[in-house]
């Protein structure tokens, strides 16, 4: 009977005992057996029973449920989550079908909806297959009211308006003159909703004046306020930082005679790592590598005001014009920073490698160091190439030679490890003396950067291995293997390029590297790294270790940047505790809180990434304002139901070609091919295509760029702005051309990952 009950629940989710008895044809005492079967299935965790919605298969939603809209995914699909979810597992993804009439719901809105699993209720859908539901709205139960809005004040003959900075915002808001709080036209403000409407616009009241949009420094402030990044330090934390004193070398290993070097970008705002390497006298061809890291734990003790603010921030956040530090500048830019020629406390690891780059041993120590030189990547690279900068001392030249020799052997082991090797050009915003954007360029990728990365990775591995061997709890940096859903989508795309990729294989980073190598010289080479990146999971912090897929490492933790990452500070405290390195070790209270801490700092890291990305987008949009109407070569980097994302060849600036600007044809979104296909013209726009485009709109407030195709394949004149100034706060109707059939279980989020 168990199998039959499960079949019926698959076809009739939410059926209660009476429904099941009727479907099974059971009467009288025969129902007792059904009751026993239901109890057994519930005890086995196979089904769930709810008072109002009856029985469902474990992890399944009923046919009708109340859901809350949570936002949009990278493809513009509206997402929702069930209000009632009793399972310990993550709820399945719900895609909301926009209503045919009336305004679309927004984030926070509660909906009564009919839910249908993608593929049907009777299809087998294991929990790890990326379950998804499609929701058809029955009625809207409650409209959401944002508690805080950030936007720009615009004066008009009809009165003041608030233009939200969020690209996804559904229109403008009205501001009564009495609610302006002194804010002027073109001023960035924070506002809160108030009761009432003016000429169809919802009303808001200004609660904070942030800055004038005429000032270039306001661009970063938009992202800071939009993402809720803490800026001001509490007085107690500032007082502790100001009271901090230089360390006493007593009780520490003296490393001041070792010519440790810092190698950083020219605009580095903190220096938390220094390196030295030389030949190992005990192993022919081997090397000793010393990585010294700022001893932040000496100054930031558990439970202190500094510590509470540091964990709240989670990490430093970097913008083109400023940094929002995790620690006050008295520490981050001074006492903790490994300045040239100044005594500084450090936590160091001494690693011994053989001639092939395999680690023989490691040892952690708490010391005092004195940096022999502060170098930039370019200076180190010149020295490695035999052309050291003028004035470089013989000691520094000799030290760099030893570092380079060690790196050459370490690359042998790295090559065998075969970590994921992506070529992802990074935009760099160059500001002029006046704070405005002087240029947008790509960051140069030097071998000296790879050297520092390799030294840091090895130090991080040593920290994880040492703590695990000492049985001391820690927070790992983990990166899961790609999900089946993403691998299947990746395989489907590769098949359209005649590249073989077995869906059922056990993947390793080397599999992706071979595909990247095979793509060299092919038309799709420029986007293959992006496609591989999108197939990956996001790295997170977790006290439970699952390894790091991208780096192809079994054990990995963040140890090398405690000035700017709280995760590293936790690892430092764990090392101090594990090896009896003095005061400031990890406490029992901190150990108990590690799961919550890991979850929190994962959130703050993603918050910082989003803020940094949004700020860069706004700087780029401001820079491109003067080039509206110009034409460019662009490559398609993303294909969605609502248009094409493109990247300009000359600057890396990214924007959207709306599907409505592609002409009168009906374009179907082919997810497997990553293409938009014209039903009548058979015109195809594919990922990786190079197009001639014209910049139609640049919006510094939101950071959006809008393009139109110039090569005759699209209808430039059909381009429409996402929002017309002066429209009330509501959702525009979606173009019919953006509603083709799609497989919603095959969604992919296009977001950057970090190691």
Task: Identify the meaning behind each predicted range.
Residues 73, 141, 157, 210, ...:
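A generic structural motif
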Residues 88-97, 169-174, 652-670, 717-721:
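A short macromolecule-binding patch
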